[in-house]
Design a protein with these regions (language model features):
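Hydrophobic/aromatic-rich alpha-helical bundle segments in the mid-to-C-terminal region
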Residues: 75-80, 93-137
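Short alpha-helical scaffolding segments that buttress acidic/His motifs in well-ordered protein cores
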Residues: 47-48, 62-66, 102, 106-109
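An amphipathic alpha-helix adjacent to DNA-recognition modules
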Residues: 4-28
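Append "Primarily bacterial transcriptional regulators
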Residues: 1
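Short amphipathic alpha-helical interaction patches enriched in hydrophobic/aromatic residues
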Residues: 27, 31, 69-73, 109-114
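Amphipathic alpha-helical packing segments from all-alpha helical-bundle domains
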Residues: 24, 53-63, 68-100, 126-127
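Hydrophobic alpha-helical connector segments
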Residues: 25-59, 102
């Protein structure tokens, strides 16, 4: 460890940096494949259900990173960068305010689905996305 990293904290920070990069890559892959607004909305629903699809490792790592970010500025910066990159991918299809709302929706619904004993159905996710992305008069 000491050959590549100055200590455990540097190793941990690098591991969380790589982890957050893998999640952003999923966002970029799903949203990059969308060619229309409807496909982009479906991609957002796919993200919610993919991220909450039973991979406890990702859920645990995400929450451990959030805990560190709440306590330590270096990890807060890492999560800020992660959110910024996720929103940029959403902005390929949605305006910045909508992208920010969708990013929070993805996060919240993913956490709720992962922790519920009976996760909500895709229809609820699709309806929430439609409400956020509906044209406003």
């Amino acid at each position: 460890m000491t050959y590549h990293f100055s200590g455990m904290d540097e190793l941990l920070h690098e591991a969380f940096t790589r982890f957050s990069g893998t999640i952003v890559a999923v966002f970029e892959e799903r949203l990059g494949a969308a060619g229309s607004p409807d496909e982009a909305r479906e991609a957002v629903a796919d993200l919610v259900h993919h991220l909450s699809g039973g991979n406890q490792r990702e859920l645990i790592l995400t929450h451990e990173l959030y805990t560190l970010a709440a306590r330590r500025p270096a990890y807060r910066e890492l999560t800020r960068t992660w959110m910024s990159r996720s929103r940029r991918a959403l902005e390929w299809h949605f305006d910045p305010a909508t992208a920010r709302q969708l990013d929070a929706l993805i996060e919240g619904l993913s956490i709720h689905r992962a922790l519920e004993t009976e996760p909500h159905e895709r229809a609820l996710t699709v309806e929430a996305i439609a409400r956020i992305t509906a044209p406003h008069a």
